[in-house]
Amino acid sequence: MYIGRFLVLGKTLNGKPFVTYRVSSRSFPNRIAKIMNDETVAILPKNLEEMFKNPYITYNCVKIVGNIAVVTNGSHTDIIADKIRIGLPIRDALSYSLLTMDYEKDDFNTPRIAAVLTDNEAYMGYVSDNDIRIKKVELEEGYAYYLSTYEACKITEHQKIEVSKNTPEDLCKFIMEHNEFEKPVTSTTVLMDSGFKIATL
Protein backbone atom coordinates (compact mmCIF):
# COMPACT_ATOMS: atom_id res chain seq x y z
CA MET A 1 0.00 0.00 0.00
CA TYR A 2 1.31 3.45 -0.89
CA ILE A 3 0.52 5.97 1.86
CA GLY A 4 3.06 8.68 1.01
CA ARG A 5 5.00 10.48 3.72
CA PHE A 6 4.09 9.37 7.22
CA LEU A 7 4.74 9.72 10.94
CA VAL A 8 4.99 6.92 13.49
CA LEU A 9 4.49 7.96 17.12
CA GLY A 10 4.77 5.49 19.96
CA LYS A 11 6.80 3.83 22.69
CA THR A 12 9.48 1.19 22.44
CA LEU A 13 9.18 -2.11 24.29
CA ASN A 14 11.34 -0.64 27.05
CA GLY A 15 9.07 2.38 27.42
CA LYS A 16 10.95 5.11 25.54
CA PRO A 17 8.74 7.56 23.59
CA PHE A 18 9.74 8.09 19.97
CA VAL A 19 8.59 9.54 16.69
CA THR A 20 9.77 8.38 13.26
CA TYR A 21 9.21 10.22 10.00
CA ARG A 22 9.49 8.38 6.70
CA VAL A 23 9.53 9.84 3.23
CA SER A 24 7.86 7.59 0.68
CA SER A 25 7.73 8.94 -2.86
CA ARG A 26 6.94 8.03 -6.44
CA SER A 27 7.98 11.37 -7.95
CA PHE A 28 11.08 12.48 -6.00
CA PRO A 29 12.83 9.36 -4.62
CA ASN A 30 16.37 10.78 -4.51
CA ARG A 31 16.26 12.43 -1.10
CA ILE A 32 18.04 12.04 2.22
CA ALA A 33 17.34 12.91 5.85
CA LYS A 34 20.33 14.88 7.12
CA ILE A 35 21.10 15.84 10.72
CA MET A 36 21.97 19.54 10.46
CA ASN A 37 22.71 20.08 14.17
CA ASP A 38 21.54 18.85 17.59
CA GLU A 39 18.12 20.44 17.03
CA THR A 40 17.36 19.99 13.32
CA VAL A 41 16.93 17.27 10.72
CA ALA A 42 16.29 18.31 7.11
CA ILE A 43 14.97 16.48 4.07
CA LEU A 44 17.19 17.35 1.11
CA PRO A 45 17.42 16.18 -2.51
CA LYS A 46 20.65 14.40 -3.36
CA ASN A 47 20.86 16.67 -6.40
CA LEU A 48 20.29 20.16 -5.01
CA GLU A 49 19.02 21.41 -8.37
CA GLU A 50 15.86 19.36 -7.79
CA MET A 51 14.74 21.74 -5.04
CA PHE A 52 13.78 24.21 -7.78
CA LYS A 53 11.39 21.69 -9.36
CA ASN A 54 9.03 21.47 -6.40
CA PRO A 55 8.73 23.76 -3.34
CA TYR A 56 7.63 20.89 -1.09
CA ILE A 57 10.56 18.46 -1.34
CA THR A 58 13.08 20.36 0.82
CA TYR A 59 12.27 21.23 4.44
CA ASN A 60 13.18 20.73 8.08
CA CYS A 61 11.31 17.66 9.29
CA VAL A 62 12.59 17.75 12.90
CA LYS A 63 13.04 20.63 15.31
CA ILE A 64 13.95 20.21 18.98
CA VAL A 65 12.78 22.99 21.31
CA GLY A 66 14.11 22.32 24.80
CA ASN A 67 12.46 19.07 25.88
CA ILE A 68 9.96 19.08 23.00
CA ALA A 69 10.36 17.41 19.60
CA VAL A 70 8.40 18.67 16.59
CA VAL A 71 8.30 16.33 13.60
CA THR A 72 6.35 16.98 10.38
CA ASN A 73 6.23 16.45 6.63
CA GLY A 74 6.93 20.05 5.60
CA SER A 75 7.88 23.65 6.29
CA HIS A 76 5.31 23.88 9.08
CA THR A 77 7.93 22.19 11.30
CA ASP A 78 9.58 25.57 11.82
CA ILE A 79 6.30 27.42 12.40
CA ILE A 80 5.13 24.97 15.08
CA ALA A 81 8.55 25.04 16.76
CA ASP A 82 8.62 28.85 16.76
CA LYS A 83 5.17 29.05 18.37
CA ILE A 84 6.20 26.58 21.07
CA ARG A 85 9.42 28.52 21.61
CA ILE A 86 7.50 31.74 22.38
CA GLY A 87 5.29 29.95 24.88
CA LEU A 88 2.18 28.69 23.10
CA PRO A 89 0.77 25.41 24.44
CA ILE A 90 1.41 22.48 22.13
CA ARG A 91 -2.23 22.13 21.09
CA ASP A 92 -2.45 25.82 20.22
CA ALA A 93 0.86 25.81 18.34
CA LEU A 94 -0.31 22.88 16.24
CA SER A 95 -3.76 24.35 15.61
CA TYR A 96 -2.48 27.80 14.65
CA SER A 97 0.29 26.51 12.39
CA LEU A 98 -1.75 23.91 10.52
CA LEU A 99 -4.69 26.26 10.05
CA THR A 100 -2.59 29.13 8.73
CA MET A 101 -0.25 27.02 6.55
CA ASP A 102 -3.11 24.84 5.24
CA TYR A 103 -2.62 21.77 3.05
CA GLU A 104 0.06 21.77 0.35
CA LYS A 105 -1.12 23.41 -2.87
CA ASP A 106 0.27 20.72 -5.16
CA ASP A 107 -1.49 18.50 -7.70
CA PHE A 108 -2.69 16.18 -4.93
CA ASN A 109 -3.74 18.69 -2.23
CA THR A 110 -1.30 16.84 0.03
CA PRO A 111 -2.17 17.11 3.73
CA ARG A 112 0.24 18.56 6.25
CA ILE A 113 0.85 16.14 9.13
CA ALA A 114 2.61 16.72 12.45
CA ALA A 115 3.61 15.08 15.72
CA VAL A 116 4.86 16.73 18.90
CA LEU A 117 6.51 14.71 21.67
CA THR A 118 7.56 15.56 25.22
CA ASP A 119 8.59 13.36 28.13
CA ASN A 120 4.97 13.01 29.24
CA GLU A 121 2.74 14.13 26.34
CA ALA A 122 2.25 13.25 22.69
CA TYR A 123 0.14 15.01 20.06
CA MET A 124 -0.71 14.34 16.44
CA GLY A 125 -2.34 16.69 13.97
CA TYR A 126 -3.15 17.19 10.32
CA VAL A 127 -4.83 19.55 7.91
CA SER A 128 -6.25 18.31 4.61
CA ASP A 129 -8.43 19.95 1.97
CA ASN A 130 -11.56 18.91 3.88
CA ASP A 131 -10.53 18.37 7.50
CA ILE A 132 -8.34 19.54 10.34
CA ARG A 133 -7.67 17.71 13.58
CA ILE A 134 -5.40 17.93 16.61
CA LYS A 135 -5.40 15.11 19.15
CA LYS A 136 -3.48 14.24 22.29
CA VAL A 137 -2.70 10.53 22.19
CA GLU A 138 -1.80 8.07 24.92
CA LEU A 139 1.25 5.99 24.08
CA GLU A 140 1.53 2.30 24.91
CA GLU A 141 4.75 0.32 25.19
CA GLY A 142 5.44 -1.71 22.07
CA TYR A 143 2.90 0.10 19.90
CA ALA A 144 2.79 3.18 17.69
CA TYR A 145 0.22 5.23 15.81
CA TYR A 146 0.87 6.09 12.18
CA LEU A 147 -0.45 9.12 10.31
CA SER A 148 0.14 9.59 6.59
CA THR A 149 -0.52 12.01 3.77
CA TYR A 150 -2.45 9.47 1.66
CA GLU A 151 -4.85 6.63 2.54
CA ALA A 152 -4.22 6.94 6.29
CA CYS A 153 -4.71 10.63 7.11
CA LYS A 154 -6.59 9.94 10.33
CA ILE A 155 -5.77 9.68 14.02
CA THR A 156 -7.36 6.45 15.15
CA GLU A 157 -6.77 3.29 17.15
CA HIS A 158 -7.14 1.38 13.88
CA GLN A 159 -3.88 2.90 12.64
CA LYS A 160 -1.43 1.29 15.05
CA ILE A 161 1.47 -1.07 14.49
CA GLU A 162 3.49 -3.24 16.86
CA VAL A 163 7.03 -2.04 17.53
CA SER A 164 9.79 -4.42 18.63
CA LYS A 165 12.84 -2.14 18.31
CA ASN A 166 14.44 0.00 21.01
CA THR A 167 17.10 2.23 19.42
CA PRO A 168 16.59 5.14 17.00
CA GLU A 169 18.78 3.41 14.41
CA ASP A 170 16.77 0.18 14.60
CA LEU A 171 13.49 2.09 14.51
CA CYS A 172 14.54 3.87 11.30
CA LYS A 173 15.39 0.54 9.71
CA PHE A 174 12.19 -1.11 10.95
CA ILE A 175 9.97 1.62 9.51
CA MET A 176 11.92 1.80 6.24
CA GLU A 177 11.52 -1.96 5.77
CA HIS A 178 7.89 -2.21 6.91
CA ASN A 179 6.39 -4.40 4.20
CA GLU A 180 2.92 -2.88 4.36
CA PHE A 181 4.08 0.55 3.16
CA GLU A 182 5.57 1.01 -0.32
CA LYS A 183 8.19 3.29 -1.94
CA PRO A 184 10.54 4.02 1.02
CA VAL A 185 13.06 6.82 0.43
CA THR A 186 14.53 7.95 3.76
CA SER A 187 13.65 8.17 7.45
CA THR A 188 14.59 9.76 10.75
CA THR A 189 13.78 8.86 14.35
CA VAL A 190 13.78 11.00 17.47
CA LEU A 191 13.81 8.94 20.67
CA MET A 192 13.50 10.32 24.19
CA ASP A 193 16.02 8.76 26.59
CA SER A 194 17.56 11.25 29.03
CA GLY A 195 17.29 13.84 26.28
CA PHE A 196 16.71 13.24 22.60
CA LYS A 197 18.61 10.76 20.46
CA ILE A 198 18.35 11.19 16.69
CA ALA A 199 19.12 8.79 13.87
CA THR A 200 18.60 8.85 10.10
CA LEU A 201 18.60 6.27 7.34
Swiss-Prot record:
EC number, UniProt record: 3.5.4.10
Molecular-function annotations in GO: IMP cyclohydrolase activity
Keyword entries, A-Z: Hydrolase, Purine biosynthesis
Pathway: Purine metabolism; IMP biosynthesis via de novo pathway; IMP from 5-formamido-1-(5-phospho-D-ribosyl)imidazole-4-carboxamide: step 1/1
Catalytic activity from the UniProt record: IMP + H2O = 5-formamido-1-(5-phospho-D-ribosyl)imidazole-4-carboxamide
Paired cysteines (S-S): none
Keyword flag Coiled coil: no
Metal-binding found in the keyword field: no
InterPro entries associated with the record: IMP_cyclohydrolase, IMP_cyclohydrolase-like, IMP_cyclohydrolase-like_sf
Pfam families: IMP_cyclohyd
GO terms for biological process, alphabetical: 'de novo' IMP biosynthetic process
Family: Belongs to the archaeal IMP cyclohydrolase family.
Known role: Catalyzes the cyclization of 5-formylamidoimidazole-4-carboxamide ribonucleotide to IMP.
Protein name: IMP cyclohydrolase
Organism in which the protein naturally occurs: Methanococcus vannielii (strain ATCC 35089 / DSM 1224 / JCM 13029 / OCM 148 / SB)
